[in-house]
Amino acid sequence: MKKTILIIGAGFGGFWSALSAVRLLDQHDRQDISVQVLAPVAELRVRPRFYEPQVHTMRTSLTQLFEATGVQFIPGLARQIDVAQHTVTYQDTAGMTATLGYSALVLAAGSQLNLPDIEGLQAHAFNVDSIEQAERLETHMQRLAALPDTPARSTVVVAGGGFTGIETACEMPARLREILGADCQPRVIIIDRGQSVGASMGTAIAPVIAEATAELGVEWCLSSSVVAVDEHGVTLADGQRIDAATVVWTAGVRASELTAQV
């Protein structure tokens, strides 16, 4: 009976796992093992760059590559892993439930942005966790020019001072000037629980981060957190109010729920 290596996820981890597997199988002339990839779409999405403009360009189709290398792509979303039975239950593109068997399983489902139960967060904040969410942010920013010229219009609050938060914040001054004009006076504020700039990055790189953000005019609000978001801005834990037309949430990620099943 032919064996199957099933890979959940078509991101960088799943993509390279599939190519590595077919390469090794070819080197050892193993015709008795197939490689399958289960993911919602056969696309490689460059997630670390979703904070940039023109986010729709940050993806490429994997269909031809999978076909050329003999990888079988199965469109669907994995829902449950049964380790004892060596099966994966998934939802296909029609919304129907189906099951796949496997001989070996590679879980490369990645992580998701953590969205805590904060008042107004999901309704009023943006994020760059997926292309779809990043496109929503981009559309919103393009519409800023139609809003009244107030300080809030040119203010962006970024919640979270990790890699994604810093990269997003550093991109914003230039984006605001491009959209609102060279005379725009952007205000970009990173809200972070840490007690020092770039605390989560380590002490060695912190001075570099502090210098780079200062040169761009990015502010830091340290030892603080967002407790509420509305259409006009945020409220911080100490009661401080920041009016901002744009709020971007980047504070933390969590592993795929599938990891608890293996």
Predicted regions and their residues:
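Short glycine-rich anion-binding loops that position phosphate/pyrophosphate groups of nucleotides
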Residues: 13, 110-113, 253-255
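Beta1-alpha1 glycine-rich phosphate/pyrophosphate-binding loop at the start
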Residues: 1-75, 167-200, 248
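FAD-binding core/adjacent interface of flavoenzyme oxidoreductases
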Residues: 2, 71-155, 248
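Rossmann-like NAD(P)H-binding beta-loop-alpha module
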Residues: 138-186
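A Rossmann-like FAD-binding core segment of flavoenzymes
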Residues: 34, 73-84, 174-262
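Short acidic/His/Gly/Ser-rich catalytic and metal-binding motifs that mark active-site loops
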Residues: 44-47, 114-117, 257-258
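Conserved N-terminal Rossmann-fold NAD(P)-binding element of oxidoreductases
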Residues: 8-9, 107, 159-160
